[in-house]
Amino acid sequence: VRIEGPIGATERASAENIIPILEKAFGNPNVKGVVLHIDSPGGAPVEAERISTAITGLKAKHRKEVVAVINNLGASAAYMVALNADRIIAAKYSFVGSIGAIMAPWQLDKAIAKVDVAQRVYASGKLKAFLNPFTPVSPEVDRKAQQLVDQMGGFFLAEVKARRGQALKS
């Protein structure tokens, strides 16, 4: 099962594309184990979670070993998928891991102000439009964004420890 390129809802490596391939592989009585060929920088954590959930469920149902083979890159959400394998194999120079979360919105409010353009935003709450790149960022918005990133990164790290804890080096 090839998981190549960015993982995302509109990408080739989407849950919608990958899960049927997983189901076919696991459901084939001639297949003794499933190999995940991973070469991906990661991407959308929800898509990775959907793929991971499918792998976990299919492993339990069909009792087949899963091996993740990471070629050049198995980072972030791609590593999240690899965590569901019974074994992870990577080359000496494979880039593996990149555990955590990132949010990198643009801040364009000062740039558009220079050309005398402004966007009016009407939102039902103070933080409803906090990722809007055309509005100034307040310390409260910065704190909220960092809190969300820390929370997502914490979830990811806990999953790594739960699934790979014995294999991790100090």
Predicted regions span which residues?
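Small-residue-centered hinge/linker elements
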Residues: 1-65, 73-163
